[in-house]
């Protein structure tokens, strides 16, 4: 019988994941484009060279004739040339991507209301009337360009921790009571508002102030908002780092939870236990990514829907998850006599989404961390509990400059 060669097999999928996760680490440690480019080049060259050498040396039999050595050396030389050519191609592609990512002004963009908005020059002063893009602007490194912000900024921990000066900025009100005159008086180069403020956007546009309307109410729309705002402000490089991190976490969860049985999850809103999010809302995709199934999947409302105790008991979820800013507590739910027969309550599976830095169940860029946290609750064997803590620390230190000791 012919002796089987001793082979070392590198699975393509595992190799791909390794490159993906290491890219995220590189993005965190190397923010300068030239450093990141050279690091990736060396990493790619070393990885390909190692893979080729392992496959040639590991798969060679002990009975191979000595005459094959020159051929191996020739192949190695060819492989080295290929590595060099590949690295050079990667370098060129990176440079072209960076050049293409820079915004050339004037630029005309289509916002999330379908409006065409033209910016004559890179914005130097920005007003955000919505906390979701406000958080994004900090992550994009634009906090020093902000001259106005939504009401109640002093209530948001993320501002106190990452950009305390924002708390002192003039308030432009809320979506319900927007201060149009106050916003216009700031003479900003760019204003970012929620979709529901279409009328205010029209009024500001008539005054010659560019306004972007955003509506990040799904994973796809959140990504679209990040791309829109970063293009408008010429911060695509930073946005790409942020999107790469988000994508790496989605990939991690999707791969790890691919074979799990989804758990039934009821998400309770801020104002009431009997207020919940249907499948049209961002929070539903957050549950699904964590390996859960939205108990309210039959609801057709596009906003928070009100239900009854009878309906909640009929769904009988395995888990009840409270919104991070809920006006009631986990103990309130566990001690609610109306829910004594609910599986989640009987088993003590009632939790609240973390909100000590910002509301992770809202469509902020950090909302990917809510899925990581929830996955640790629903599937602790696949996603250890400390995964959320580790990723949360990494995310906020990388994009907000916040370092947590505990």
Positions of predicted regions on the chain:
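Short, positively charged and aromatic/hydrophobic N-terminal segments
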Residues: 8-9, 14-23, 28-32
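Bacterial N-terminal signal peptides that target proteins for export
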Residues: 37-47
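Hydrophobic core
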Residues: 48, 52-56
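Bacterial lipoprotein signal-peptidase II cleavage site
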Residues: 58-68
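Extracytoplasmic substrate-binding proteins
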Residues: 99, 106-109, 115-118, 199-275, ...
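A short, structured surface patch at a secondary-structure boundary
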Residues: 128-186, 190-196, 295
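Proline-aspartate-enriched helix->loop->beta-strand connector
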Residues: 172-175, 180-193, 209, 308-325
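Alpha-helical, coiled-coil/dimerization segments enriched in small aliphatic residues
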Residues: 276-304, 308
